[in-house]
Amino acid sequence: MRFSLITATLGRVEEVRCLCVSLSKQTFKDFELYIVDQNEHHELEDIVRNFEKNFIIHYIRSDVKGLSYNRNIALRMCKGEIIGFPDDDCYYEVNVLQEVNEAFSSREEVGFCAVTTRDTVTKRVCHISQKAYLYKKDVLKACTSIM
């Protein structure tokens, strides 16, 4: 498995469905998605079932609220070489995983990369002036929290 993606969610249903739709359209298919559901309701279970035929998706219920706590639940289960943390209100352009894979494949020393993002509400784009890489030797120094 190349990528493991972890989304901890609370209070969002339609947004998670949009994320799953975007992942089902990826040009790079070697990934799995973990949905860690902190909601009181069980509406996301049906969404997960609807996407099981498109890609590997794991549904995890959690009664504990908290982003880092719930990401760590899924992190223990991941099989991917590269871990990503898409928010529950984001979606990926069709080639995002392909581009990230190429970034990691082209330079063995790369340990982290970032991509341009767009706020879906304000439509503001956060441009990265150049390819944003963090080398493996610098990852721990640059992180403010470690999971």
Q: Can you name each region flagged by the protein language model?
A:
Residues 20-61:
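Acidic donor-binding segment of Leloir-type glycosyltransferases
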Residues 95-127:
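Conserved donor NDP-sugar-binding/catalytic core segment of glycosyltransferases
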Residues 20-21, 45, 72, 80, ...:
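Short alpha-helix within the catalytic core of nucleotide-sugar-dependent glycosyltransferases
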Residues 1-25:
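N-proximal low-complexity "stem/linker" segments adjacent to membrane-targeting elements
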Residues 62-78:
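Glycine-rich, basic loop-to-helix element that forms the pyrophosphate-binding segment
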Residues 83:
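Short aromatic/hydrophobic "clamp" motif used to bind/position activated sugar donors
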Residues 87-91:
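The conserved acidic donor/metal-binding loop of glycosyltransferases
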Residues 115, 119, 126-147:
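Short, flexible, basic/aromatic active-site loop/helix in glycosyltransferases
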